[in-house]
Amino acid sequence: TNNICQGLLKAQLPGRFQVLPGKPRIILDVAHNLSAIHILSTSLSGMADHQKTYGVFSALKDKDIDGVVQAITSEIDVWLVAGINSSRGASSDEIVEALESVGASKANGSILVFPDPVAAYVFAYKQSTINDRICVFGSFYVVGKVMEYLEQEKYG
């Protein structure tokens, strides 16, 4: 993960509201604190029409998960909670609890839990239509893993 973080920092800040070409619209943002999440939420709300937004999300334990979720919940229709394979990662249960506190629910399908960011992203991509968008956010780890996957898919 340290190599991923270093690579992201060196390369013109990819992962900061990085919108990939094509449909569905894919947004990568390493936003992981309240200030950055407010900017991400504002940027998402200013985007052109879309039907559904899938949020591939996870966070580290030391982040304000409740505040982050509260700040962006109006922009996310389906939360795809992705596990972080690190002792610093928040548990899926902690994230689900924060999401349930703002009205999302496993029962109604607005929260789905995955073992890792790539599994969450692949699910979102397969479920989405060309009119939807997928926002991958919450940490350098989550965005980095999805970026690695996309590079492998692109270049084999």
Role assignments for model-derived ranges:
Residues 59-61, 83-85, 140:
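Residue-level signal for short, function-critical loop segments
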Residues 25-27, 34, 69-133:
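C-terminal helical cap/extension that packs against the catalytic core
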Residues 140-156:
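Glycine/aspartate-rich loop-and-adjacent alpha/beta segment that forms the canonical ThDP
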Residues 37-38, 65-67, 91-92, 145-148:
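Short glycine-/acidic-enriched loop or helix-start segments at secondary-structure transitions
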